[in-house]
Amino acid sequence: KIICISYMAEGWKKPKSLIWDSKQDDKKLLNEFVKIINQYPIVIGQNGDSFDLKVMRGRTWAQASNPLPDVITLDTLKMSRQNMRLTSHKLDWKSRLIGRGGKMSTDFQLWIDVEKSNKKALTHMVKYCEQDVLELQAVFWSMLPYCNRLPLHLGALILGHQDSCPGCASTNRIKNKTRQTRTGLRQQWHCKDCGRYWTDTRRIK
């Protein structure tokens, strides 16, 4: 079962959390999160594609809850693996690499104590999950300008056009230089907000 789900929308000061009920049933938690996730065009997670979303789909099916919507995802594990050669691609390591505190320490005993209805353990579990969300947010925005291989154009998705940064959706951009490709001359841009460089997919006429 899912003990808690911690989440955070961009612009919030701190995460929020959903917790299983007093009977350790996660059906209400799942139904609430399905409504929440349906509000956003993009979901960001660390190993979210292979773990978090699959676990939630399995639990919604087992609980006959409302199924998760089909969402666009950005997975920081895939992003770092596809764009960088690092010593480790774990969230804790990437967080510490950029000078943050990393994940909270925990062990298997915490899960045992939570299942025994230990309130102090449950509080620690929620703090652990919320800390993960904060580290994920910091790692994602720090790493984004250095990831040329993204599954989507963020600006086009959020603003509805490509005249913006594909990494942070900012329109605060300047021309950098032109690039000659096999299919024609293309403009390279530089984002003044996140620092990203990219080449326009459209040919210069």
Which residues fall in each region the model found?
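Flanking scaffold residues of small Cys/His-coordinated metal-binding clusters
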Residues: I158-Q162, L185-R186
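Acidic, metal-ligating active-site segments
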Residues: K1-G11
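Conserved DEDDh/DEDDy metal-dependent 3′-5′ exonuclease domain
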Residues: G11-W93
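Short recognition patches in nucleic-acid-associated and regulatory proteins
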Residues: A169-W189
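Short cysteine-rich clusters marking metal-coordination/redox-active sites
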Residues: D163-C168, C191-C194
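Acidic, Mg2+-coordinating catalytic module of metal-dependent nucleases/exonucleases
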Residues: I44, L91-L159
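Short, surface-exposed acidic
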Residues: N66-V71, R100-Q109, K175
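Short metal-binding segments enriched for Cys and/or His
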Residues: K192-K205
